[in-house]
Amino acid sequence: MVQGRTVLFRTAEGAKLFSAVAKCAVAFEADDHNVAEGWSVIVKVRAQVLTTDAGVREAERAQLLPWTATLKRHCVRVIPWEITGRHFRFGPEPDRSQTFACEASSHNQR
């Protein structure tokens, strides 16, 4: 869930919560594609487990609900500090003879 310029998620005890607490810098990646093109985005973030009553109340105002019927008591806010990504179109592989010709030509010039 996006709140302001941050992302919130709820989690249970376990790996995600441990990673958020143990590391000051965390990254997550989102990818998607269709038949013609694809994209990939990597977001580097600083993660904060919300422990104060005020922080938890603010997160609850975002109506942050779990997708699955499991108990997820911990709220984590991630604050992005770097976003990178790429977009690419699918197509046929380049002609190998042209690729090798270019490589051989640049090798002979050395």
Swiss-Prot record:
Superkingdom per UniProt: Bacteria
SUPFAM superfamilies: FMN-binding split barrel (SSF50475)
Reported induction: A member of the dormancy regulon. Induced in response to reduced oxygen tension (hypoxia) and low levels of nitric oxide (NO).
Name the record gives this protein: Uncharacterized protein MT3215
Species, as recorded: Mycobacterium tuberculosis (strain CDC 1551 / Oshkosh)
